[in-house]
Amino acid sequence: MKRSKKIISPLASFNYHLENYNGLIKSFRKNKDISHIGSMLNDCYTSELTSKIFVEDYDALVLTDKSQKIVWVNDGFNDMTGYTKKFAIGKKPSFLQGEKTSEKVKKQLREELAFNHTFSGSILNYRKNGELYLCKINILPIYNLDEKLKYFIAIEKDETKMNQSF
């Protein structure tokens, strides 16, 4: 009597499918974000902004008016911070800052935005539960067709897992 050999399938194939699934979900979320932003920005929306959002690896998007009050956040904002859209809208993103947030970074951020410049950097923020997280931010000014500042968009990534030195 011959013994049959058992064939064991590696989990690599499962991981491959899981990665593809996660990539597909990210793509759907990005398309949803792009659609929402496009409908809000009307005469300010450009293909450059679409490309930037689609290419960037982000956890949250925050859209503010020119006075830096939040007018829209994506679903990832709640996942990253613990705060709901309803709570965030109308507030300035500085509500996420706290005692350990660098004064130097806050000053640099204020100065760049005061001159309608872009800002790229990392800042320590606080989640709703009080937990610190390191947030990589890329902020872009958005102008209308008359080249007047209308909005800022912050493309944010939680870098806490990559840098635990705070």
Named regions from a protein language model:
Residues 1-59, 63-65, 149-166:
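PAS-family sensory modules
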Residues 57, 112-122, 135:
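PAS/PAS-like sensory domains
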Residues 77-88:
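PAS/PAS-like sensory domain cap-loop motif
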Residues 89-100:
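PAS-family sensory/regulatory domains
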